Structures are given as C-alpha cells and as structure tokens.
Amino acid sequence: SETAAEKFERQHMDSYSSSSSNSNYCNQMMKRREMTDGWCKPVNTFIHESLEDVQAVCSQKSVTCKNGQTNCHQSSTTMHITDCRETGSSKYPNCAYKASNLKKHIIIACEGNPYVPVHFDASV
C-alpha cells in the first residue's frame, strides 16, 4: 500500500509543470492524482519544484505544525505552488476547482528514516 511519503508525492508534487496553472489544471490534476475519488478534497496545494528541493526542506527551519506537532519545517526560499480550491458550485462527482498561482514559503511535516516529507501543512 501507499506510504505517507508516496502519498505526499502523489498529492503535492508536480515538478515539471509550469506554475502558470489555471482552473483547468486544478480540475485535471485533482482527478488524475485521485483526490476526487468518493468525495472532492476541498483544498490542495501542488508544488512546482524538484523533489530534491522539497525533500531538502526537511533539514531547514523547524516550526510547529498546525496540529501542534513539532516535526514541521519551513522552506528557506519561496517556491512556486498552485493552490486548488473547490468552487462554491462544486458538487461530487463533478468536483470543480479554481487555481491560485503563488510564490510562497512552504511548511511541510517530515518523518521517518530517511527523513522525508509526509504532509503539506501551510504556505506563508
């Protein structure tokens, strides 16, 4: 079955697409990455940077996660990301999203050995 690290990659990594995504991008990617199976995931962030650069965040600044855990890390540089948010008219199975292209610091949770990203916490 899928590991937490693999799930992070499926849900959040899109290294090779340009960061100039639109709502069409979100609608396709949310479906392609299986986040509209059984329900519409309300919000999801895709990161347009190399996996290596995102994994490196695990050794950058430690911050507290939203849930109070202490294994979150904030990227030292800003990263190109796309926020996909469900629109008001979205209704399963016709999930609909709007895209925001942003350049922000990401905050991710890391765990394991090797110490790798397992959860996207926030962007700041």
From Swiss-Prot:
InterPro entries: RNaseA, RNaseA-like_dom_sf, RNaseA_AS, RNaseA_domain. Residues 1-23 are annotated as: Disordered. GO terms for molecular function: lyase activity; nucleic acid binding; ribonuclease A activity. Pancreas. One of its GO terms (biological process) is defense response to Gram-positive bacterium. Substrate binds at residues 7, 10, 41-45, 66, 85. SUPFAM superfamilies: RNase A-like. Disulfide bonds join 26-84, 40-95, 58-110, 65-72. Endonuclease that catalyzes the cleavage of RNA on the 3' side of pyrimidine nucleotides. Acts on single-stranded and double-stranded RNA. This is Ribonuclease pancreatic. It comes from Camelus dromedarius (Dromedary).
